[in-house]
């Protein structure tokens, strides 16, 4: 291979490698999950080490705790061992929460997909949470004699984590900012509650984004964030979408 050819590739790595991971819960318990790993290296012209072999050696250390200092220490070690310019790691996995129905208080498991990512040269870990919520259209409510169209929506909340943040607290921040929450177990009294709760709290997707942004901006442990909300419209062919990034706000 010529020297010119050796400089064409900018990044190399592995993707979709499944590994066991342990997540801490707010109640002090540990939750075992399976994470899909992606790790990429921004390469120089030549490599000193074997990327796949080094990944397999170091990955078990990443699964023990998701904590900024330990992750960045391991990433720097990885970077030096294989002689690359930059390393980026992401782990994606489901996180389960036992959630009570609002009236019957019956419990069911809610699944929240999350991704943790970090790079050498950066100080924090970025946590991305995918949270289902309910939106109810304010316009539909205003023009109708009875009822209003409502639907499930997905909020994607990305937070730069320089100090530890409980996933449950981030999920709660998002869920409390929508027309109503989503539950896995609902009896008839619960369905009545969530229907009326959404009707009394109509929101466009941009309203949800704004409310999350204000609450995130006031949180002492959140330094940077972005939020997107996509509503899977029940009566329209299209979906509704809104997005905001804290870098563009004066909060």
UniProtKB/Swiss-Prot annotation:
Q: Which reaction does it catalyse?
A: GTP + H2O = 7,8-dihydroneopterin 3'-triphosphate + formate + H(+)
Pathway assigned to this chain's UniProt record: Cofactor biosynthesis; 7,8-dihydroneopterin triphosphate biosynthesis; 7,8-dihydroneopterin triphosphate from GTP: step 1/1
Q: What is its EC number?
A: 3.5.4.16
Show the InterPro entries listed in the entry.
Answer: GTP_cyclohydrolase_FolE2, GTP_cyclohydrolase_FolE2/MptA
Q: A single GO BP annotation from the record? A: tetrahydrofolate biosynthetic process
Q: What sort of enzyme, by top EC class, is this?
A: hydrolase
> Any stretches that span the bilayer, and where are they?
none
Return the protein name: GTP cyclohydrolase FolE2
Native organism: Desulfotalea psychrophila (strain LSv54 / DSM 12343)
């Amino acid at each position: 291979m010529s020297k010119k050819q050796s400089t064409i590739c900018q990044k190399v790595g592995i993707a979709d490698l499944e590994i066991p991971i342990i997540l801490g819960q707010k109640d002090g318990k540990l939750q075992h999950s399976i994470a899909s790993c992606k790790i990429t290296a921004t390469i120089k012209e030549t490599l000193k080490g074997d990327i796949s072999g080094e990944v397999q050696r170091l990955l078990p250390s990443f699964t023990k705790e998701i904590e900024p200092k330990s992750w960045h220490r391991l990433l720097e070690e990885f970077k030096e061992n294989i002689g690359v310019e930059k390393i980026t790691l992401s782990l994606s996995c489901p996180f389960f929460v036992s959630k009570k129905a609002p009236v019957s208080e019956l419990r069911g498991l809610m699944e929240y997909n999350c991704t943790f990512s970090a790079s050498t040269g950066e100080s924090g870990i970025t946590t991305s949470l995918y949270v289902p919520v309910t939106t109810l259209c304010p316009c539909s409510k205003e023009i109708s004699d009875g009822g209003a169209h409502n639907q499930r929506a997905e909020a994607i909340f990305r937070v730069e984590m320089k100090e530890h943040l409980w996933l449950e607290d981030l999920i709660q921040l998002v869920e409390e900012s929508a027309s109503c929450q989503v539950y896995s177990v609902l009896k008839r009294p619960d369905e009545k509650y969530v229907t009326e709760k959404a009707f009394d709290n109509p929101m466009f997707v941009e309203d949800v984004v704004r409310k999350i942004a204000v609450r995130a901006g006031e949180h002492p442990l959140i330094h940077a964030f972005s939020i997107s909300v996509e509503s899977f419209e029940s009566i329209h062919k299209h979906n509704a979408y809104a997005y905001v990034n804290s870098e563009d706000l004066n909060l």
